[in-house]
UniProtKB/Swiss-Prot annotation:
Pfam families (alphabetical): HTH_1, LysR_substrate
Functional description taken from the UniProt entry: Acts in trans to stimulate nod gene expression via nodD3 and exo gene expression via SyrA.
InterPro entries tied to this protein: LysR-type_TF, LysR_subst-bd, SyrM_PBP2, Tscrpt_reg_HTH_LysR, WH-like_DNA-bd_sf, WH_DNA-bd_sf
Domain of life, source organism: Bacteria
Protein name, as recorded: HTH-type transcriptional regulator SyrM
Gene: syrM
Other comments on record: Has two translation start codons in proximity to each other leading to a protein of 326 or 301 AA.
Domain HTH lysR-type: start-end pairs: 32-89
């Protein structure tokens, strides 16, 4: 007597049985319509032909035909009449557990081939807070228009960023890096210089803006700014015999700007950052009385993603946004 379909043992491959014989015993995958799996998912969920048909946008007769095809393909009734409607056979109960993961895998596989505008995906960008203030207002509108299902996550901490790029924990880094290490690639986004920000009615603005006046002020710094910036300032002041205390360090550019608006402190930031925060809080922007080297902001990524179409598209969008972030 034949065993029920759901109790048949797994057919292992034994010595002496040819590959051709094994293939004759297996279902022909080429003959399987993947749309039937979507119908099966709805039938198993609703256990009602009409409701399942409505869920997938089919007519009731079309869903009935799909159920008939599924029964023939799986050699099982799947749904049988019970006292309170249709009930699942043991095989159908098993498929209820298996099918969601199978369909999820198929959907994810198909999603990989979609254009950016159709894909649902996430990108993690590491960049200092003050660079995010410059870049994101130009980048996010582009991405929302061209890839509406793309989620952007930013991380202001650059420590260990190269290792995270290699591991795939983050996708790109935006920051100051003169040359990309071996295994990484670099694309210049824009150049910038440093400038000073003070409150609009700061007493120093009514006097000659000298290096002595600059050195006498309390300085505010952003934690994510490069240490070399303060090294430049400190070295120049030291050479001139001027003393300057350590700056008050805060975590974000917004906090720094609010402090500048409320105190007699001074903030040294990239010119693009200064322009944006000054417009928000009515601050004054003036050149520093000490010469500070300009710098470049670059996009860094790992070679593992270099040829990936979606990653290449993202890099192009970041570069295009940066070109308008003047």
């Amino acid at each position: 007597m034949d065993q029920p379909t759901w109790k048949r043992p797994h057919r292992a491959k034994f010595a002496g049985v040819s590959d051709a014989a094994q293939q004759r015993q297996m279902p022909n995958l080429a003959s399987i319509d993947l749309n039937l799996l979507v119908d099966l998912e709805a039938l198993l969920q609703y256990r009602h032909i009409t409701q399942a048909a409505q869920h997938v946008g089919r007519s009731q007769p079309a869903m009935s035909r799909a159920l008939s095809r599924l029964r023939g393909m799986l050699k099982d009734d799947l749904l049988v009449a019970g006292s309170r409607g249709l009930v699942l056979t043991p095989l159908a109960e098993c498929l209820t557990q298996m099918l969601p993961s199978v369909l999820d895998a198929i959907r994810q596989m198909m999603n990989l081939s979609l254009a950016p505008a159709q894909r649902r995906w996430k990108v993690t960008m590491a960049m200092p807070d003050h660079q995010a203030v410059v870049l994101l207002p130009h980048l996010l509108p582009r991405l929302h228009e061209r890839a509406p299902h793309l989620d952007i996550v930013t991380d202001p901490l650059l420590g260990g960023a190269l290792g995270l790029l290699e591991q795939g924990e983050i996708d790109v880094v935006v920051g100051q890096m003169g040359a990309a290490p071996l295994g990484y690639l670099r694309r210049r986004l824009y150049a910038d210089s440093f400038t000073c920000v003070l409150r609009h009615n700061h007493p120093a603005l009514a006097q000659e803006w000298t290096i002595e006046a600059f050195a006498a002020l309390r300085h505010v710094a952003i934690a994510s700014e490069p240490d070399e910036l303060f090294g430049q300032i400190y070295d120049r002041l030291t050479k001139l015999g001027l003393q300057r205390g350590d700056p008050m360090v805060v975590s974000t550019v917004l906090t720094a700007a609010v402090l500048i608006a409320a105190t007699d402190s001074v903030l040294v930031v990239p010119s693009r950052v200064a322009t944006r925060v000054a417009a928000m809080l009515s601050l004054a922007v003036i050149p520093p009385p000490v010469e500070l080297r300009p710098y470049e902001v670059a996009l860094i990524w790992h070679e593992r993603c270099h040829r990936d179409p979606e990653h290449r598209w993202l890099r192009g969008e970041i570069a295009a946004a940066a070109s308008t972030a003047g």
